[in-house]
Amino acid sequence: KRLENHMKYYDLHLVLEGEEEFELCSTEELENISEKNYDEDVFFGDKEDGLIKGVLRPGYFLVTFVDEAHKLGISKPDGKHVKKIVYKIPVGGKNE
């Protein structure tokens, strides 16, 4: 699974049940960057070392900004089903 990034929306990931690992890095650190898909607001890239890593649990949240590439759903540490909500927040506070 590759790191993804968005141009028009911040992501707010809120875990309701289970646990989920994530990885983050600056988009400036990405290699092998895909073409930007503006219609779907996404592009992908790779980075092997120096990633920020963590685990989301119920009550925790993660906000990823437009300059932060992210990968979630890497593994589920407790092996259980993950239930979460992802909110898309328009950059600048309004839809473009």
Model region roles, listed by residue range:
Residues 55-73:
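Conserved metal-binding segment of the jelly-roll/cupin
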Residues 61-63, 79-96:
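A short hydrophobic beta-strand segment most commonly corresponding to one strand
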Residues 74-78:
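Short proline/glycine-enriched turn/loop segments at secondary-structure junctions
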Residues 1-10, 28-33, 49-50, 56-58, ...:
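A short beta-loop-beta micro-motif enriched in histidine and acidic residues
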Residues 8-10, 14-20, 24, 29, ...:
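Glycine- and acidic-residue-biased ligand/ion/polar-headgroup-sensing regions
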